[in-house]
Structures are given as structure tokens and as C-alpha cells.
């Protein structure tokens, strides 16, 4: 819900509240990630996720950093602000393994599906093994 004193237009757009749903019928705004703890206080309510944000170590370009990731149910609050979400983790691993068994990505997408509303929209990034092959 927009904060008291927000300037809403007729579609409910409130940029000061980071609400970008309904800007225009031909425009959908979203991001390429959704569980970013840096958005606490803007997209996500701080109190809702207190004590529920684990940390994990990531390595990029030889440098290690700590990342905090919100729980997957935060996607419900994400879609209060945006209409579309690009899922980029599908780039790194297929949905099924070589034996046809569901991978972790498959199970994670199934969980996202349980949490989506009727007007929420996902875009899946094509796996690199399919699309980003190196030419020899």
C-alpha cells in the first residue's frame, strides 16, 4: 500500500513508493532479479523479513563477496511494485538433468509459480548451454 501522502496517478503509479505497476497498458516494468536485500525499505518491508535473510558467499572475477538474499516468498511483495520479473538463474542450469530429473532450478521455479498472482509475469533467461555456445 502506498505511504500516506503519496502522489498516485489514476493507475496507482507512485514513483516515490517505488510502485511501477500500471504505468501504461503497453508497458511493463520489472527487474532482472527480485530477492535483493538492498531493497529493504524501498521494495521490501524491513520488519517482514527480519531474521529471515541468510548470507551466502559468491565469487566473481576472483573476488569473494557476501550476498544477503531474501526468502522466495518476498516475490509477492515484489509484484506489488512491478508487473514483470526476469529470472536469470535459469541461464546457469537447465530445468532437467541429463537423466530427465528436475534440477534445483525446476523446483525453485515451481515455488515461484505457487506465489505468483494472475497478472504477474516471469521472463526466463535462456540457458547458456542452449544459447551462449562458443564457436570454435
Model-derived regions, located:
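Residues lining hydrophobic/aromatic ligand-binding pockets adjacent to catalytic sites
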Residues: 1-136
